[in-house]
Amino acid sequence: MVILLICFLIFIHELGHFIAAKMSGVPIARFSIGFGPALLSRKIKGTKYCLSIFPIGGYVMLDINDISDLYRIPLRKRIFYMLGGPFGNIAFALVGIVSLNLISGNISFYSMIIDPIYQTSIYLYKIIYSIGLIFKHPDQISGIVGIVSQGSKFVGMDIIRLINFSILLSVNFAVFNLLPLPPLDGGNIVIYLFEKINPRLLKLHVPLAVTGWVLLIGLLLYATVLDVGRISAGLCA
């Protein structure tokens, strides 16, 4: 169930990018639910909508041929497009909190508007604060394996716990993607801002992106090793 939740939140993230692109006029070649060969597809107003064979998340493909086409798109539109994904995850968290309040019978202006914003802000603060603690306690990092393992234990078959966990995980997705590390959304925004500082800095796009990928993959591998170690220790205990 947690794996399906992660896939769904990835889709929500990409849907946020898609909506932001449509709102700002950024050209989209394809929007797909899932990956791999398309089972169903339809082209509407220049965008190909696909339902792909592997229903794991989704993706948005911009209608560009190379990096130069990307930089012809106005800076504000590129940044708005990149922010769309994290905002999509934040919006999902807000809806999740509203849903919990509705389930509990709390129907008021406070429970529908103020409380979701307040609780989401608290989640954001705690997650951002915890990022700083990672440098003090790097052995506490957890990756996908740990999320699935711990999340499955927490959620079980309880719908309320599932919603609570999805809210927390969605806000985590938003914060993680805003980290200033290419190829994450935050890293791409930083690279785009180089354009404002000095257009010649744009030549750093590719080397920074490659470096970012290496660091990100290294971090994920490190987190996976820690997760597997914790799970193994738990099984042996």
Regions found by a protein language model. Give the residues of each.
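Functional transmembrane alpha-helices
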Residues: 68-90, 94-173, 190-211, 215, ...
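Positively charged, phosphate-engaging catalytic surfaces used for nucleic-acid and nucleotide handling
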Residues: 176
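Small-residue-rich helix-interface/hinge motifs
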Residues: 1-68, 169, 179-184, 189-195
